[in-house]
Amino acid sequence: MVVACEVRSVGKWATAFAGLTGTSMLLISVACWALVWAQQQGLPENVMNEVVNPSLLPVGRYQFVAEWEAEKDFAHKIGRKVEDPDASGNAAWEVRVGEDTPNAHALFGPYAKVAPGDYIAFFRIKLLDEPVRDFAFELDACVDYGRRILNSVEVADLDLVQGKFIQIPLAFRLTGSPLECRVFWRGNVSVRIDKVTLFRVEGVGIEQLIRRAPQPKPTGEPKDLPYHFEPRPFPELFPRSKPPAQKLLVADLRPLPADWQFLLFTLQGLVNRQKPQIYFLFNLTDELWLDWLQKRGWVKETEKVPDARALLSWFRSFVKGMVVYDPLLPATKNVATMLCGVEDAVAASPRLAKDLNLPVIADLRDRWRTNAEAYEWAFKNLWAKLNHHVIACAYPDHIGMRDYFVQHRIFIFWISGPVDGARRGGDPNAEVRLMEKLFAQMPVNIPVMSYPWAGQDVGIGEGPGVTLFSEFGKFLVGSINCTNLSVYSGIVIPRLRQKPAPPPPKLQPDKVYYSFIISDGDNLPVLTIGNFPQLWQSPVRGKLPFGWTISPSAIMLIPAVVDYYYATATPNDYFLGAVSGIGYCYPDHYGKRFREPDRKRVFDEFLDLTADYMQRMDLRELWIMGITRPELIRRYAEKISTHRTLRSALGTNLRALFVDYGRRLTDPNSVTYPTANNVAVFHAVTGWREEDTREERINRMVNEIKAMTPTTRPAFLHVFVWNWGFDLEMLSEVAKRLGSEYVPVRPDHLALLYREWLAQQKLLVRTLTQIVAVEETPVSFGMSVFNALGKPAEVGLNVVSGLKEVKVIPAKAKIAVSEEKEFTVVGVPTGEQVRIRLSNGSIVKQVEVPLEQLSQSELAAPLPKGLVLKFAAKFEAEHLAHLSGELRQDERASGKVVWVAERNRAKIGHIVYGPYAPFEAGRYIALFRLKRLSEGEGFIATVDSCVGGGSPVTAEKRITAEQLPIGQFRLVPLEFAHPGGPVETRVFWTGQADLAVDFVALFKVEK
């Protein structure tokens, strides 16, 4: 082992070593081993002896921290304790092929409190089987209970030694606690895990050992594409199966190795292409949906297959041969699936291929160097034989949908992220550039199945992936591991109807009406696997009104599942279309790669498809996200509410749009308003934090609802519910704590009540909740008037008090029916309130808006002269996000509270950041109101602005102790150019002095 180490680490010595005698070689080996060991100071010999290649260990000082036994110090999803004389304590944890469920954690824990620093964990693991040239498991270290992975490594069976324990090192930098170490078993080979030993390391460049690829970055080319259409060879958006056989063969795949599961899913696609006959149990809910098929009469009987592998011989006549994939090049699993669909083959691992006795249609081992090369070959050689109207972005190890992919010959691709892009065959930028080229050659408005994310930094990611698809006029129908689509899609339900609605409550002038909108029903696994099936069983359901989001595509792919929800709904359950229509997309980016006016045509066709399938599912409200442009929100209302199918079928048009994935807007007066055809727009007023406890989530939701409630009554609110983090019992507690002033209603009732109130307003005036200005500095702000009169109106505005040197632009305007007109008011602040008068013949309204003047004496630096500051927003520090710090009372603060970071209590870092609110491109000034609370010197903080998410940083300023006198608030100005999109403002605390943050005021600079 040592000799191999020497030759690998110092390749130029290999030739010289070849002529030495065995004795000479041994002496050199011992000498070199001593050298290596000396460089890893503090690492025990028993650990070093079991590292396959110790020369790759970093040079530095090793300090023992802890040792955890696999069988007693960790939790397990699979496996069992076994005796092993070679293991520490004569016991180990074992997982075996054919006995344990693949793709599950064999080990996770121990959630140990460990100080921040650089570490290497050594996993002691033994291979039990002969290597099959496949991945065995993935090791990682993480914090926040798996939400933040510090480093991971994918281990193939060829990296192990059969019958002998070896030490596998994993380096990471720990910044939080408790620490979790995990072993995720792939199910391809049997292994035993003895223990995990942790060492702290010093004098080591640990970041060099954490392998990360760059986040894939699209080039933006090609662009200005022409509209590209190909007629669909099938009548609906998705290809459908034939009706299922009256008798289904039911087989349980869960006990089988992962490669057998993969093979049988491809077989299911071939067999069910002719007529659905095979139904697999793979997910925990597959029995539930099978029972429903029988209860509704779509399937008359079932026959249990004792061993699913027998199906291969039963249906041998359907199979022309096998495609052997290369387990060490992930893309070959996707290419093999495509070849199976085209060639009527099954996909086989090298291990299975040895014993199957099937003709080899294609052997993909060692065919390509990278994943990108494999996908490019597939497009050039297979695209003409594949379906051009559905594609899939599928992680190669997500196998549950392979039946549908094979059945309908679907093109499959994957774009790696920073983690999987650093592994064998990964090249994220090459992969994304290839897909840009391929997307441009595909028809518009086609669905992308599966999902572009497979874990933290695995895959291009949800946001970047959906953005890329949207730019090319494609939408995502999330469907990771949705099984048996080759069965479900054969069930035909021409139209679904929600149960008759109860009457809405009486509109009361002093109430706040709100609807719980439960997220992610666009994602088919949420409907079929989790969390909706579990939430649906809650005893709270039926006692409170809930809005359940659901994909309009579901009626084609999982009609029986939708039928289950509709049939078992209570009068308090209501369904609305999920983001952002027929599929998940970001309307702000939709069709961006196409030339004008083709971009508008592409988007309008997407809306037409959405309207068609909303009609078929009796959906009258729609949840949308990734949309900040008012004209696009209005386009939804114009197109869908007047769409011929929706109008003729339902009589009443689209009633409401529920906008955003969590709270995005910051002004309570901006979250609810009407748009075209009096369609109500309800922006989300609540968000979430993954790290919150159950109680913190309840409190956060209650506080956000109250903070985002306008002062006027009645009020109407969209309460966004992150389905991954809430259950119905928590929402019941939220309703209880809000009290009787707040009335929960169904989403359709919220829309109807709002329309009733809107009709009473006749002319609806919308202003900001407050205006913030700097003393003696011209300020401008916007307001709008919506015409709900039912006839055209001419409206005039004038400022009564609160400003001097006033201009209103325009002073008068004609407003068409169901149209909104924007007005701009400019002036120098003079009071604490701005009074504005609106007149339209007999209708006269006066609006009062609070005005807060910021003192010139608090400015840490003078503002540029000759500017008008258009007030954009005010972000109270307590309502932004924080990595550290705490809330404190302060009578001189804006809201009587500040966010404080104190030495010895808070952690160095961003104590305030957010809010990711959307703003148009332009020049801005942010005023950070800060106060130093203690002695200090040097740089005590940095303030900056950036596009939401931290990149790019648009401006930053370092703040010294001298700039902030102790005990006095100062307004620190930061000027920046914003490219458009979500704005993030941040305060980074250095720990050099105690610091309080009151708010951040944001202004757009105008001449």
Could you tell me what each predicted segment is?
Residues 806-831:
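Intrinsically disordered, low-complexity Pro/Gly/Ser/Thr-rich segments with frequent PxxP/GP/PP motifs
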